Amino acid sequence: MFNRAVSRLSRKRPPSDIHDSDGSSSSSHQTPKSTAKWASSLENLLEDPEGVKRFREFLKKEFSEENVLFWLACEDFKKTQDKKQMQEKAKEIYMTFLSSKASSQVNVEGQSRLNEKILEEPHPLMFQKLQDQIFNLMKYDSYSRFLKSDLFLKHKRTEEEDEESPDAQTAAKRASRIYNT
């Protein structure tokens, strides 16, 4: 269940089609580059499925992927309405990230850890304090390193090259029409 939720949250959404008045696609009217959006805030990065994917790749190399996985699981948990599902997800989050035997234990302050008994009566914000701790850990530690990482910079360069490419193709098309080649 947890893996499905993370997969769903980090799945890439299809880009919007942006067209000129003549119906042709135009790169000059597109939204800001994803890397610029990611660099503006951790919140923006976490709202973008491709950003989450790249951030996870980076965190995996740093052996701290559990932080973003925990954050995503908490986001999914907050959206859960069914009481039974909420109870199952709460236990899964606890067993995966918070218990002393957790397979992907996150680093939260000892007094912030939840008592297993609270899992019997879950509520949407029960993990909020812990999620905020992990968010701040990522924001002030991993995120700044991610923005300087080869992985991010390579993606940024690729994005810039792709942005230049359509203009060059458009110029070539115009030249071929002018010179009938």
UniProtKB/Swiss-Prot annotation:
Q: Where is this region: Disordered?
A: 1-40, 157-181
Per UniProt, what is one GO molecular function of this protein? G-protein alpha-subunit binding
Keywords annotated in UniProt: Cytoplasm, GTPase activation, Lipoprotein, Nucleus, Palmitate, Phosphoprotein, Signal transduction inhibitor
Q: Where is the composition biased (Polar residues)?
A: 29-40
- Provide the lipid-modification sites (S-palmitoyl cysteine): 74
GO cellular component annotations, sorted alphabetically? cytosol; nucleus; synapse
Give the Phosphoserine positions (modified residues).
24, 41, 176
Segments forming domain RGS: 41-156
SUPFAM superfamilies according to UniProt: Regulator of G-protein signaling, RGS
Would you say which domain of life the source belongs to?
Eukaryota
Location of this chain's protein in the cell: Cytoplasm, Cytosol; Nucleus
Q: Name one GO biological process term.
A: positive regulation of GTPase activity
Functional summary from the UniProt entry: Regulates G protein-coupled receptor signaling cascades, including signaling downstream of the muscarinic acetylcholine receptor CHRM2. Inhibits signal transduction by increasing the GTPase activity of G protein alpha subunits, thereby driving them into their inactive GDP-bound form. Modulates the activity of potassium channels that are activated in response to CHRM2 signaling. Activity on GNAZ is inhibited by palmitoylation of the G-protein.
- Name the PANTHER family on file: REGULATOR OF G-PROTEIN SIGNALING LOCO (PTHR45945:SF3)
SUBUNIT field: Interacts with GNAZ, GNAI1 and GNAI3. Associates specifically with the activated, GTP-bound forms of GNAZ and GNAI3.
Q: What is this protein called?
A: Regulator of G-protein signaling 10
Gene coding for it:
RGS10
